[in-house]
Amino acid sequence: MSSSTESAAVTAAENEVDTNAQASREAARLGRAYHARGNVNLIVDSCADFAPEVARALGVEVIPFPYVMSDGEHADDLWETMSAHDFYERMRAGEHVTTSAVTPGHYLEVFERAAAEGTPTVYLAFTRGLSSSVDAARQAADMVREAHPDFQIYVVDNVCPSAAAELLAIEAVRQVANGLTAAELVAWAEEARYYVHGYFTLDSFD
């Protein structure tokens, strides 16, 4: 590697570190304001592709989606149990990865816990266009409403996956911090989700 190429690589890495640090600081500020307000419990899932430090700083619950590799099922837990490096190295080596939806039972467990706490809850769910999980979430939410008629729980199809869903979720935290109620947040999200778009490229069709 030439000195100029090495210098450019170092600069790019430093810029990425600075950007991540700035995002974490902003997320921490939003998280403090969101929790201080305390009137909405926002839940998201791992298909929003949160940077782990941002999710921790915001303090929102992230439901992990399952994926399966040759050694069995794993939880997409924001790289806690398997690093991003190890995951993609296995894929580059030819590992076949499949995914599956979150079960109604898992959603029921999460929503029952939220009902016990009593704070109105909004789940920004991975879009129905790519997964049946939102149907499972709505089924679980209906069961919780039956058991707890006074508890407010809403399931919103976020329409957009990956980083676009992350942006929507971060802005939702901001809206709660600014004072929106759960019902108002749902109305906001059902409109705002159409203003966020994601673009993807593929290395191959394998």
Regions of interest found by a model, annotated:
Residues 41-106:
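N-terminal glycine-rich anion-binding loop in soluble enzyme alpha/beta folds
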Residues 2-64:
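N-terminal phosphate-binding or glycine-rich loops at protein starts, especially the Walker A/P-loop
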Residues 36, 108-121:
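Glycine-rich phosphate/diphosphate-binding loops that line cofactor/substrate pockets in enzymes
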Residues 32, 174-206:
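Internal, active-site/partner-interface "lid" segment
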Residues 120-128, 154-157, 171:
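Short glycine-rich or small-residue beta-strand-to-loop segments that form or flank ligand, phosphate
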Residues 125-148, 166-169:
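Short Gly/Thr/Asp-enriched flexible loops that form oxyanion-binding sites at enzyme active sites
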Residues 103-114, 139-143:
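Short, charged beta->alpha transition segments
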Residues 141-162, 178-186:
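Short, acidic/small-residue loops that bind anionic groups at enzyme active sites
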